[in-house]
């Protein structure tokens, strides 16, 4: 709307025409005027936000289709190679005025694959690796539990040549980049709203992944989570999501304890005489997640009954029964918290049981 009429050459050439309205459209990243204008806008941003240490400079969200097909862009190579070239040019323009500011771009969907040749990144560029890998198993479980071989997807890559952790290491090797961060999705209801009422607890998987991120060289992790209406998680989601979100936050702050230790400490503070039983309940949920081998990647959860099978539901019911047997020993906030967690499980169980199975009927129980 702002530039296309006067400068169509700034936008992606797709199927022989400049088209900023094609799905997943991109700019023409080889265009020097696009580079100049981008640098000017970032310069203005840093001047208006002097305490900001970093700005995001990534391709538009989307897949492969909208990347420019002009001769200059095609000469640069793959989408990943195009974006490395573009971000390096912007970093060079800004370096003199802003030597300590970083430009971050996502290794994500069309830029998942590493460059095919050595392409060193400017020292002020940060790679953010978006965790396109299994949601139920750690990134170092080998190799990423085979998700890149066993499944084909209708979004992002149709297949993955390298599992996530190996792919990230390859990126670092080919770009000599030492500024690393990670984007992880903690929004289980984003793709399927039914998960807004179903627990998803990662347990020690969460802190194990954080150790892998740290060994990769990550300076920080960004957890894409709620409360956010777009993710179907709101302020009211905290009682259901706290074992997921709290462990992620605590593990970034203190990398020594495991998730089990973090949850154990929290349960002692929250649930009084039911602390150990509540911990067993959360660890049961985490174990069910870890035993799930259904198709799940990034923020796309498996179908509820694929994780919460009848056998898994029975295990959680036994853990819940052990908690109920202790309610007579509780009072005040401790009792209210326990009753809240038990009610959330009963609601989740009803949702799972009534969710359509693959044959169109409710899940079998």
At which residue positions do the language-model features occur?
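Charged, low-complexity, helix-prone segments enriched in Lys/Glu/Asp/Gln
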Residues: 83, 245-247, 266, 278-285, ...
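Aromatic- and carboxylate-lined catalytic core of secreted/periplasmic carbohydrate-active enzymes
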Residues: 230-303, 317
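Catalytic-core regions of glycoside hydrolase
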Residues: 1-36, 40-260, 307-313, 317-321, ...
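Amphipathic alpha-helices that form helix-helix packing interfaces
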Residues: 278-281, 285-288, 292, 312-315, ...
